[in-house]
A protein has these predicted regions:
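Gly/Ala-rich beta-loop-alpha elbow adjacent to hydrolase catalytic centers
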Residues: 76-85
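Serine-hydrolase catalytic machinery in alpha/beta-hydrolase-like enzymes
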Residues: 1-70
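Short beta-strand/loop motif that positions the catalytic acidic residue
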Residues: 121-124
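Short alpha-helix in the alpha/beta-hydrolase fold that links the catalytic acid
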Residues: 18-19, 131-140
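C-terminal catalytic histidine-bearing segment of alpha/beta-hydrolase fold enzymes
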Residues: 146-182
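Short beta-strand immediately N-terminal to the catalytic nucleophile in serine-hydrolase-like folds
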Residues: 72-77, 103
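A conserved short beta-strand
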Residues: 94-106
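Short, conserved loop/helix-junction motifs that constitute active-site signature segments
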Residues: 94-95, 111-118, 140-143
């Protein structure tokens, strides 16, 4: 099984490269064509992403990559990467993705009508500022091909560069991914 990581707004960072090695992921999809942008903080990363890439262009990057996949693959996405995976999951031109694991995809709340064509595991943080996590989790868990989990950590807990990074949570979820992503 191929594992493909789909990054958040920070893009391809040294920490994400390390995660890809730990999971034996063959591909990292990011919005900046593989360039480490070395953002100083989340505000800078968000501003740059919104001004220079945006949701739809990042979705197009992922769609183009997934259309070239020739063997069964699992997508693992973080934040905006998780949200674009969610949106992609309803596209019937995507043939060789059989599973996705999406960490804290907060923009999923704007695409509640999506009906995934492959299995999607949504991992929600304990809370989000812009919406009720439990309400969204309950709504989406009723859909076919969707499983939801709410963890006791904040949005960004897997990202070393996030103010909400949590080493314990990162290690816990890394171990879970090693068992469940392949």
């Amino acid at each position: 099984m191929n594992i493909i990581l789909v990054t958040d707004i920070f893009g391809k960072t040294p920490a994400l490269v390390k995660l890809s090695e730990e999971l034996n992921a063959k591909v990292i999809v990011d919005p900046y064509a593989g360039v480490d942008m070395a953002f100083k903080d989340e505000a800078e990363a968000y501003s740059y992403f919104m001004e220079n890439v945006g949701f739809e262009d990042y979705l197009s990057i992922l769609l183009e990559m997934t259309e070239s996949i020739t063997s069964a693959s699992t997508l693992i996405g973080f934040s905006i990467g998780a949200s674009i995976i969610w949106k992609l999951s309803e596209n019937n031109s995507v043939k060789n993705v059989n599973r996705a694991i999406c960490f804290y995809g907060s923009q999923i709340r704007n695409f509640k009508k999506v009906n995934p064509l492959f299995e999607v595991e949504l991992i929600f943080p304990k809370e989000e500022f812009h919406f009720d996590v439990l309400e969204l989790q309950n709504e989406l868990s009723k859909k076919e091909n969707v499983r939801t989990t709410k963890v006791d950590y904040l949005h960004g807990f897997m990202n070393l560069y996030s103010t909400n990074y949590n080493q314990f949570a990162h290690n816990e979820q890394l171990n879970w991914l090693r068992i469940n992503a392949s």
